[in-house]
Amino acid sequence: PMALSFRKSVLSAERYESAGVFDVNGDGIPDIVSGGYWYEGPDFKRQHKIGGVTAHDEYYDDFSTIAMDINGDGRLDFVTGGWWGETLRWRENTGVADQDWPMHDIAKTGSIESTRAWDVDGDGDLEIVPNTPGKPLVVYKLIRDANGKGTGKFTTHKLKFSGRENDHQGHGLGFGDITGNGRGDFVLTNGWLEAPENPYEGEWIWHPDFNLGRAPSVPILVVDLNGDGKNELILGEGHGYGLTWWEHNLDATGKRIWTSHAIDPYSSQ
């Protein structure tokens, strides 16, 4: 078999909190987007301005870069937000070279550890889900017109929990099918939420089956690692050391048993 090799390329001296890969200029070639700039593919040597990003000490307030055509103009914009700004936002791709991309607020959310995009309601479109420790779990759904194009507006859906004293998140968030019924369930720090038939109106059933630690990663991956038809969990320690996977089994009574296995206990974040 052919051996793999990798070559490191330094794109810029700037540092930001996140990066995304998507076609900014519509030429069919993926570009790299990070913070205040995007880098034109395929060699990523040409740097283009996006606009300023608020800095807080050594951090920037851009803890995600999620590509989505939010206003339906055919150009990919992106969703971002951060810890200190406590606001979920999107930046508008104007299509004009080196013109600042306008920033639009989606919602005041509380401090955002990171944001993910998952198809929560199974309609084939991605929803936006920020991980906001100490705050409720809320899904933001892009409003689309009759042609399926984004309108630049979102609806807000605060999920209802059943069997839990509060509806707060911790540090760490995952999404995937735990039960095998085809619906996506949410994985939190110390348990998981079983999806109802209607994710926005029904109650999500709380299962305190495990404790993933103080600050598991965003995302927590939900995937069948051992080929037994049940999804396992993969997570890293967000502010410490360790990469682990959690094996998912059922005992004779049908109770779910989760067993932690170390992948790499020595690496950080």
Residue ranges and their predicted role:
Residues 1-269:
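Beta-propeller-forming repeat regions
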